[in-house]
């Protein structure tokens, strides 16, 4: 039976609506999947039922030449092995809290996917509506591509926001900020939102940066946005050269839902 419900409607440029049947997308994708071997994997990670994959069994634009993988600790999904276009895999890392377990998967595509050349991590509350992301990745030509932050252009502004909202341990935030300041991290260097991450994950520099990033997340704030731009700066990478417009502003290309749970 076709999934014909309200979330299948999104505005287009003419303020009309488009209707896409999820079951048709899934069937078409799975049929083509059996005819090829993918070099690209699109993946997400859901811990502690932070989001419900049953609500998004496919992106409305499912790239026919990419595999889709979801890591989760949801036993029902693990037993099923497949939800829509998503191949279900159990978590590979469970030694941290639910947030850091997610972050490990986010930062370790080189460990998780040795058989793929490229990967796109995407938060589980984002639905890809068009081929825009795949085009911008090709046009950018960088081994790392991600969105701009919707508000901040300075990492220190993000530290203030996270502190004010009490989103993590104040002690860890202060310790991490001091590392940046002592290292000479400049203000207004540029800033990213890490809800979509394309990587050529076997690139040596990318692997080293991901290891550095994970080290910061492990030892300091679990808020990964507080450390990635610092890693980019240390490696001489300008955010403006590897970013595209924030997903929330690209309403014809992405739909960003609220998370099922706060983290």
Describe the function of each predicted region.
Residues 1-102, 112-116, 219-222, 234-237, ...:
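N-terminal anchoring/stem segment of glycosyltransferases
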Residues 39, 65, 121, 193-196:
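Extracellular structured ligand-interaction cores
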Residues 42, 68, 110, 125, ...:
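A residue-level signal for conserved active-site and pocket-lining positions in enzyme catalytic cores
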Residues 43-46, 71-73, 122-124, 130-131, ...:
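Short His-Asn-centered micro-motif
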Residues 47-50, 75-77, 93-96, 126-128, ...:
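Short, solvent-exposed loop/turn segments at secondary-structure junctions
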Residues 53, 69-103, 130-141, 157-187, ...:
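Core catalytic alpha/beta fold that binds nucleotide/phospho-ligands
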Residues 108-164:
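GT-A fold catalytic core of metal-dependent nucleotide-sugar glycosyltransferases
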Residues 167-263:
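Catalytic core and acceptor-binding pocket of nucleotide-sugar-dependent glycosyltransferases
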């Amino acid at each position: 039976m076709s999934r014909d419900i309200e979330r299948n409607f999104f505005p287009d440029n003419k303020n009309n609506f488009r209707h896409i049947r999820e079951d048709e997308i899934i069937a078409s994708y799975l049929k083509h999947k059996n005819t090829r071997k993918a070099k690209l994997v699109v993946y997400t990670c859901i811990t502690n039922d932070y989001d419900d994959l049953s609500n998004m069994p496919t992106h409305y634009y499912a790239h026919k030449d990419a595999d889709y993988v979801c890591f989760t600790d949801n036993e029902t999904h693990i037993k099923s092995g497949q939800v829509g276009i998503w191949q279900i895999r159990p978590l590979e890392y469970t030694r941290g809290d639910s947030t850091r377990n997610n972050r490990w998967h986010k930062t370790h595509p080189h460990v998780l996917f040795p058989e793929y050349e490229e990967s796109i991590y995407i938060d589980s509350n984002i639905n890809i509506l068009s081929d825009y992301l795949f085009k911008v990745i090709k046009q950018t030509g960088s081994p790392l591509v991600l969105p701009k932050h919707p508000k901040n252009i300075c990492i220190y502004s993000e530290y203030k926001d996270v502190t004010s909202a009490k989103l993590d341990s104040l002690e860890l935030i202060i310790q991490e900020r001091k590392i940046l300041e002592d290292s000479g991290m400049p203000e207004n260097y540029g800033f990213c939102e890490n809800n979509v991450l394309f990587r050529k994950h076997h690139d040596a520099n990318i692997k080293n940066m991901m290891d550095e990033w994970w080290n910061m997340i492990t030892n300091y704030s679990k808020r990964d946005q507080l450390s990635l731009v610092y890693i980019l700066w240390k490696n001489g990478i300008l955010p403006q050269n590897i970013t595209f417009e924030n997903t929330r502003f690209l309403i014809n290309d992405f739909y960003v839902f609220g998370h099922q749970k706060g983290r």
